[in-house]
């Protein structure tokens, strides 16, 4: 039985978003799983247009904010930026979220 590559890629993108990954992280994960890079980028572009990765970044920010309550503001920001970078989020959206959540 042949697997529809695009359906698999879309399913994998939803999985990546549930793990709060960004676009870069999702493309990297799809390619690692054997999806063609062009298809991976196409599916991630569609998901990005739907706001999937933006919402994942906001959820990552909210979780980081909850976990770091009471810590120094710079420490909280650094932890958020580190997590966002590891998960492959766009620095522009990370900057916006950090500004709003951590001042």
Can you annotate each of these PLM segments?
Residues 1-103:
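An alpha-helical, amphipathic repeat domain used for nucleic-acid recognition
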């Amino acid at each position: 039985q042949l697997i529809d590559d695009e359906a698999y890629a879309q399913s994998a993108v939803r999985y990546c978003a549930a793990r709060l990954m960004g676009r870069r992280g999702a493309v990297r994960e799809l390619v690692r799983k054997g999806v063609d890079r062009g298809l991976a980028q196409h599916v991630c572009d569609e998901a990005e247009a739907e706001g999937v990765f933006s919402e994942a970044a906001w959820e990552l920010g909210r979780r980081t904010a909850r976990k770091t309550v009471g810590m120094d503001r710079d420490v909280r920001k650094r932890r958020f930026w580190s997590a966002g970078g590891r998960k492959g989020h766009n620095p522009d959206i990370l900057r916006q979220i950090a500004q709003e959540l951590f001042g």
